[in-house]
Amino acid sequence: SLFQNTYLRAVSLADPDRILVVCNEIHQFLVMDQIAELGHPIADARLLREPVGRNTLPAVACAAREIRKDDPAALVLVFPSDHMLGPEAIGEIRSAVDLAQENLVTFGIRPAGPHTGYGYIAPGVAEGPGFRVKEFKEKPDRDTAAQYVREGYLWNSGMFLFSVRVFSEELSRHQPAIAAAFEASVPDYPSLPSLSIDYGLLEVSDRVVTVPLNARWTDLGTFAAWYEIAEKDGDGNVGVYDGIR
């Protein structure tokens, strides 16, 4: 599954006992079964269950809180579970470790063409293997997307790397209510706002850099995106089977 591929990608970068999975509580047993199929049974403490969905910022903040307890100097790498990413990206991700010590790193994808389904990143001044982020752009129309591609913008992949310290500092600075909620012994998760990490933190922080990835990447969050990359039969149909057909 896409989730299993994402988990294996994480295992290629960290020991299983340093991997946290955040999911809605209604998916917890499915997640546990899928990880067990890979031969990596997940400890209960490594599975964080959201009682309600509150978008990506509270989910990442929840994980960062647990990671900080174990290792206040840890680096946090965030992978969505519905992406396809070529294995060559692993080395490029590792190249961002130094930048992530003092910055929020977002990984940008060099566009294969104008795409209206992704947000865009305007790279600024070069810094190490990446660039200081000049601006984030929302999903554009096709003409605007073509202009972004001509001007060297990157697709916003939704993958991030940062130190838990820097994340906590920026969360306290820009979203103090969310930061305060996670200082409580038992955070009141349902009371948190629904907020993406892009909108709630990255677009307002001045400590954001982007590192371009040259690997093949696709956000497979829709059936249309899956159809684009899947093998098709002579009639243009796509079939994925688990069993006898």
Residue ranges and their predicted role:
Residues 1-78, 84-90, 94:
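Conserved N-terminal catalytic core of the sugar/cofactor nucleotidyltransferase
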Residues 23, 79, 140, 162, ...:
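A conserved hydrophobic position in a structured secondary element of the catalytic/binding core
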Residues 162-245:
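Left-handed beta-helix
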Residues 3, 63, 82, 121, ...:
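Residue-level signal for inorganic ion chemistry
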Residues 53-58, 113-115, 142-143, 217-218:
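A short acidic, often aromatic-flanked loop/helix-cap motif at beta-alpha or helix-coil junctions
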Residues 86-180, 186-189, 209:
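Conserved core of the sugar-phosphate nucleotidyltransferase
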Residues 19-20, 46, 75-77, 103-106, ...:
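Structural motif
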Residues 24, 81, 109, 213:
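Cofactor-binding loop segments of dinucleotide-utilizing enzymes, especially the Rossmann-like FAD-
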